[in-house]
Curated annotation (Swiss-Prot):
Reactions catalysed: DNA(n) + a 2'-deoxyribonucleoside 5'-triphosphate = DNA(n+1) + diphosphate
Swiss-Prot/TrEMBL keywords: Cytoplasm, DNA replication, DNA-directed DNA polymerase, Nucleotidyltransferase, Transferase
UniProt source species: Streptomyces coelicolor (strain ATCC BAA-471 / A3(2) / M145)
Lineage, broadest ranks: Bacteria, Bacillati, Actinomycetota, Actinomycetes, Kitasatosporales
A biological-process GO annotation: DNA replication
Region (Disordered): 77-99
Consequence the record notes for mutating E802K: In mutant TS-38
Oligomer and partners: DNA polymerase III contains a core (composed of alpha, epsilon and theta chains) that associates with a tau subunit. This core dimerizes to form the PolIII' complex. PolIII' associates with the gamma complex (composed of gamma, delta, delta', psi and chi chains) and with the beta chain to form the complete DNA polymerase III complex.
Protein name: DNA polymerase III subunit alpha
Family to which the UniProt record says this protein belongs: Belongs to the DNA polymerase type-C family. DnaE subfamily.
Enzyme class: transferase
Subcellular location(s) of the protein: Cytoplasm
EC number: 2.7.7.7
Function field: DNA polymerase III is a complex, multichain enzyme responsible for most of the replicative synthesis in bacteria. This DNA polymerase also exhibits 3' to 5' exonuclease activity. The alpha chain is the DNA polymerase.
Amino acid sequence: MSKPPFTHLHVHTQYSLLDGAARLKDMFDACNEMGMSHIAMSDHGNLHGAYDFFHSAKKAGVTPIIGIEAYVAPESRRNKRKIQWGQPHQKRDDVSGSGGYTHKTMWATNSKGLHNLFRLSSDAYAEGWLQKWPRMDKETISQWSEGIVASTGCPSGEVQTRLRLGHFDEALKAAADYQDIFGKDRYFLELMDHGIEIEHRVRDGLLEIGRKLGIPPLVTNDSHYTYAHEATAHDALLCIQTGKNLSDPDRFRFDGTGYYLKSTDEMYAIDSSDAWQEGCANTRLIAEMIDTTGMFEKRDLMPKFDIPEGFTEITWFQEEVRRGMERRFPGGVPEDRQKQAEYEMDVIIQMGFPGYFLVVADFIMWAKNQGIAVGPGRGSAAGSIVAYAMGITDLDPIPHGLIFERFLNPERVSMPDVDIDFDERRRVEVIRYVTEKYGADKVAMIGTYGKIKAKNAIKDSARVLGYPYAMGDRLTKAMPADVLGKGIDLNGITDPTHPRYSEAGEIRSMYESEPDVKKVIDTAKGVEGLVRQMGVHAAGVIMSSEPIVDHAPIWVRHTDGVTITQWDYPQCESLGLLKMDFLGLRNLTIMDDAVKMVKSNKGIDLDLLSLPLDDPTTFELLQRGDTLGVFQFDGGPMRSLLRLMKPDNFEDISAVSALYRPGPMGMDSHTNYALRKNGLQEITPIHKELEEPLQEVLAVTYGLIVYQEQVQKAAQIIAGYSLGEADILRRVMGKKKPDELAKNFVLFQAGARKNGYSDEAIQALWDVLVPFAGYAFNKAHSAAYGLVSYWTGYLKANYPAEYMAALLTSVKDDKDKSAVYLNECRRMGIKVLPPNVNESMSNFAAQGDDVILFGLSAVRNVGTNVVESIIKCRKAKGKYASFPDYLDKVEAVVCNKRTTESLIKAGAFDEMGHTRKGLTAQYEPMIDNVVAVKRKEAEGQFDLFGGMGDEQSDEPGFGLDVVFGEDEWDKTYLLAQEREMLGLYVSDHPLFGLEHVLSDKADAGISQLTGGDFGDGAVVTIGGIISGLQRKMTKQGNAWAIATVEDLAGSLECMFFPATYQLVSTQLVEDAVVFVKGRLDKREDVPRLVAMELMIPDLSNAGTNAPVVLTIPATRITPPMVSRLGEILTHHRGDSEVRIKLQGPTKTTVLRLDRHRVKPDPALFGDLKVLLGPSCLAG
């Protein structure tokens, strides 16, 4: 008689993080190969994989069984202690987290059971967390047991653990308790056999309990991978989890064998006993209980907005739009805007989304009312006039040619997706608001799956195999570079059919010729793509009208109590849960700070939304490419494009951000646009028949397809598509599937023929639209973000000190970016001063038109409380007249030696006339004295002055009447100390005066290397000062070093590997000015230079007769200007050479004025700044 087919019920997928290595596709393929109709998942303590498992199984034709191998607290889940199960000598028999939990396997038989598993898993994270285990207990299991079938679990189950410890009666009671909870026919004795002693030792006891209580046996295989040959990869995965090497004899490993998906015959053949045979057959009983009806069904879970009495959701939505239109157009709503608003409202109501708009508009309005900066729009939502009316966006879509159907398409119903930018510092306040408004159980952050990518798989595998770090590092560097952030997978190395196979020649050669490399990569293939950890979406929030745990499980991050879904956002969205993106945009923070600073510094109230979009000063800045620090326009190549394009209207700003992307740039669209705009390239129509009908669509982009909206409009005008149908066509074109394109071309051609166009014209248009549809950009997004670019450009052009101060504050924790923007301030003629206890605020602050003060909070070792106290005491008691006066006035919390030393070295007391060296020699005993007095004063023993000093003196006593030395440290030491405290050279720079020396031999500034000007592998020479040096040894005993080389605008790590180091080691000295030639390595997040040569420049005459370098945009060169410049240079005759950096649209040319020699003094510099502007001397 044939045996019933076996069903695997104890299966750990890759979602048993770093413990399960079973990939879902492999599992279901194996089931189909072995004729198994059902399979369960039972991951450790979570349901992260439930959605993926369910739908992947259904797709493969296998019935999914959703289960969990739960952690069960031995007492209450709220009790955060471990218990001692047995005597010390029985420790080996306690395999239950050292008394922290036991295991239990449970499976959902129907939709009710599935949702009860959601509840159990979620509560385990929320209330049962202990160290790293989310634990349920008998109370919660009893409460949510309906629809669930369970077993005694693996050898770590409570019943088995008590049996191993010799506690039969306790084991019997535990089994009886669970039988009562689940029911007589829904609780089983779980039998396993992997050839290990702890499984066999309790078998008789388990079966005895079964006989006494009538509990049937159930055989499982503790599967952790799909195929037997994957045991080695799984072993490596365990080592990745524990941080051990495979060769470590004491590492965690699985005892026994056979942890894969065995066939029915293999499972029955393990043991011929009746109990085992019955247990195998009983797996079919559970399979037959499974009813997946209603599982993972999509529902309408839109959060419910509170509607005022007398309105329905629809009528209140219409009323809000009406009021919003009146606010936006106080002089009367134009007819075209009103008509569009009515059309959009009809579509939104028809699609069932009025509640969505009300919810979004509400929290945006709340944020604005709280003074939280909100972006003007993002993505396709900016194409909706309803969104504009309701305050969701701040850009009128009609003048910019934006299309509503790009946002909501009545031809293709899908959830609207509005992403909102907030001031990054206050984004959490908005999330808190919606959490409180809709309920903490109805709002959660969104989980993400962190997978083991190819390069990490290589590094991890090299480590667990015992190879040195250099092995993994060498292999990852030989991998092809990422393309658009996506790396090649490891199969691409050896699979000739892989699209990137040809790029992997270097690592393939190593794989084929070096056995150790082959071993590493083969091991890496076994773990690549597995889920390593759960993370949290940077911006995504799930909102629901019902408790989220009724529809999806959650987990809790116990460092801050944040609730997070166990699934990612596409999975959550497919169930009807609303996903919103609450994004933090640093530039909103910068603009908010700058606007407030303009008010405090100049008394001007700026309203960004009211700014004219044709400010000449702003467009002059853009045309010069002076956009370092301007949103989206910060990079070197982008600045070059701006100089070439010469934008003079807002449409250009929108276009440049759309064009500056790999697709359009690969087709030279950015250059063609710039040339056509400036009359340097003829504007040719796509076809003469199409010139007039497409004139309105293409005129703004000089005949080029730049935007997705243009593709839609062209299909509407030429082929008669509705804008909704055209959006679907655009998506088809973007995917470039030949069969779909062919089918759609027939429809497109028919529509165009009907409108009277020739086949030649139709084909010409199609041939242009198809490639560009994939590259064209969403104009709604580029226009909305273009507005932010314009605002930041406006602030930099019109309020440079305030804007740059806000910009420096935003990057104060990134010293490389701080150096770039500090140098930009110098170029702009803005003086950045060291911190000053009498003037500085917490952050960078503008003073007047051309001074920025360093913020006190940017000083190392100076905490927020200290800064607040310094400012508070200064406001209450007046400025500090001297260092003793400072110690007298500030609170005791400020009188900290480490803090005070940092402030001294940073220059915060320079204004008082004390030298830093003099203060450093005296501050410690002074603090000792004043702290003792302040302590007694706080205890009420006496007043600080208390008659102890001269009654007529304004100076405090108690050892504070000190004479300070007037000597100062030498410049090198002083600047080194300043840099240590501020992370930057501020008051001066060791390289000032040496710019001409560096520019003579350096190929580029360091900021150009760390930006996008140079690609990976480029051989370049940089110049600067060695500001940090680490000497190291390889495992083979060879010396090498990492030198940090810094110039005026950035720093870069230079790797001197042994061969090079041996030649230059004596020249590698901190504070030395050097040139380094090397190969740029940009494969990691932070670029580095692999040094090939080191050169020491001759600085003996560097400070004398240094050339005067003038930076002049080519557009400024006019005969009157040249004439006046000659007069100035002649008037200030001297011995220094004059050079001009002539900034053209794509490159800068350096000219030497051999006829002129000048005296570089303030008088010359003043005349030059009047003629050429304050930034002409900044190089």
